[in-house]
Amino acid sequence: MSKHPMTVEGAEALKAELHRLKFVDRPRIVEAIATARAHGDLKENAEYHAAREQQSFNEGRIQELEAKLSHAQIIDISKLPNNGKVIFGSTVTICHVATGSELTYKIVGEDEADIKLNKISYSSPIARALIGKELDDAVTVETPGGMVEYEIIQVQYIVE
């Protein structure tokens, strides 16, 4: 399986969730199963079945996070040369050529992308068009509404 880029912040967030699932949620669920089991007949014990379902979900999420972390290529933006090029992890401000409106995005891994926080995946159409370009370059992005042209007006390497 190939490696997937991830920022240091993204990896730390996944590690924190994994730690919580293993050392907080897992013991709590095991205790809930034991308590429900003590109530008697397991066939009609909704509390027991709910706890087992929760355990199954928790263990599945643990496996998912471990797989993501094992296949992550963690990229520390602070260790990369700041040469004004748009790269994974950089924060880019672009200007819509036709309207003059400005947008700022941070290019992150797929698991970290959140458009509400202006974080876009490196595999998104906008990020693919921006990566490798430099300050003042014009880029054309294919959108559902057609081709849109942007100008790169700022490239920052911000470590959160």
UniProtKB/Swiss-Prot annotation:
Gene Ontology MF term list: DNA binding; RNA polymerase binding
Superkingdom, natural source: Bacteria
Example GO biological process: DNA-templated transcription elongation
Keyword presence, Lyase: no
This protein's UniProt keywords: Coiled coil, DNA-binding, Transcription, Transcription regulation
Coiled coil location: 50-70
Role according to the record: Necessary for efficient RNA polymerase transcription elongation past template-encoded arresting sites. The arresting sites in DNA have the property of trapping a certain fraction of elongating RNA polymerases that pass through, resulting in locked ternary complexes. Cleavage of the nascent transcript by cleavage factors such as GreA or GreB allows the resumption of elongation from the new 3'terminus. GreA releases sequences of 2 to 3 nucleotides.
Similarity annotation: Belongs to the GreA/GreB family.
Identification of the protein by name: Transcription elongation factor GreA
Protein species of origin: Legionella pneumophila subsp. pneumophila (strain Philadelphia 1 / ATCC 33152 / DSM 7513)
